[in-house]
A protein has these predicted regions:
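Accessory interaction regions appended to the cores of large information-processing enzymes
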Residues: 1-184
Length: 184
C-alpha cells in the first residue's frame, strides 16, 4: 500500500519471535483502525505508517504494555516519495501554542531545526506560532517542546505537501541509490 498521506513509518518487532510477519498479523487484530495511521504485516514485523509522531504514540504504548522488554521498536523514519529518479520529501505544517514567556526558547529551537516561521500571534496569556519544515527536521519536536515549556506547550503537526529534494537523504544520489519511497 502506498499511503502517501502517511509520511512517517516505524517498525515494531518481537525479539523472541523468529517469524515477524506472524507477530505483525497478531498485533494488527489488537490495534484499533484510525484515519491517522495504517498498519501492515511485513516480513520484518509490524510496519506502522502515520501522519505524525503523535499518531504513533497510542499503538506504541499499547505494544509496550503487552510485550514489555520483548518489543523492539526501530526509530521513526521519514517516508520519501520518488517520482522518476528524483526524491521528494514531506513538508509539514506546524502550529504551536505556548505561554509568551517561552516564545524566545521556542523560536530558538525553530532556528536550530531550520523551521520557517509563517505567522505569529501573541497575546498577554498565549502565543501561537505557525510554521513549516521538512518532516526530517521535526522528528522529536514534541519532546523538545515539552522540555522547553515545562510540559505546557501544545503543538500540532500535519502533512502539507511533498517537494523535490536537491540533496537526497543520506547522500544517496552520490552512491547511486534511489531514495526510499512511499510506494515501497
Amino acid at each position: 500500500m502506498v499511503h502517501s498521506e502517511f509520511p512517517l513509518e516505524r517498525l515494531a518487532q518481537l525479539a523472541s519471535n523468529p517469524f515477524q510477519i506472524g507477530f505483525a498479523r497478531q498485533v494488527m487484530r489488537m490495534l484499533d483502525p484510525s484515519h491517522l495511521i495504517a498498519y501492515e504485516a511485513a516480513q520484518d514485523g509490524l510496519l506502522m505508517r502515520a501522519q505524525n509522531e503523535e499518531a504513533l504514540a497510542r499503538p506504541v504504548a499499547l505494544l509496550r504494555e503487552v510485550y514489555g522488554d520483548d518489543l523492539v521498536l526501530l526509530p521513526p523514519q521519514v517516508r520519501y516519495m520518488s517520482l522518476g529518479n528524483r526524491p521528494y520529501e514531506p513538508i509539514m505544517l506546524l502550529r504551536v501554542r505556548i505561554a509568551p514567556r517561552h516564545r524566545e526558547a521556542v523560536l530558538g529551537e525553530f532556528a536550530e531545526r531550520d523551521v520557517q516561521l509563517l505567522e505569529e500571534h501573541e497575546r498577554p496569556s498565549v502565543c501561537v506560532l505557525r510554521a513549516e519544515a521538512p518532516l526530517r527536521k521535526l522528528l522529536g519536536y514534541g519532546e523538545a517542546l515539552a522540555k522547553l515549556t515545562d510540559g505546557t506547550g501544545l503543538h500540532w503537526i500535519w502533512l502539507d505537501r511533498y517537494i523535490p529534494m536537491s540533496d537526497p537523504p543520506g547522500g544517496q544520489a552520490a552512491e547511486g541509490k534511489q531514495a526510499p519511497s512511499c510506494g515501497d
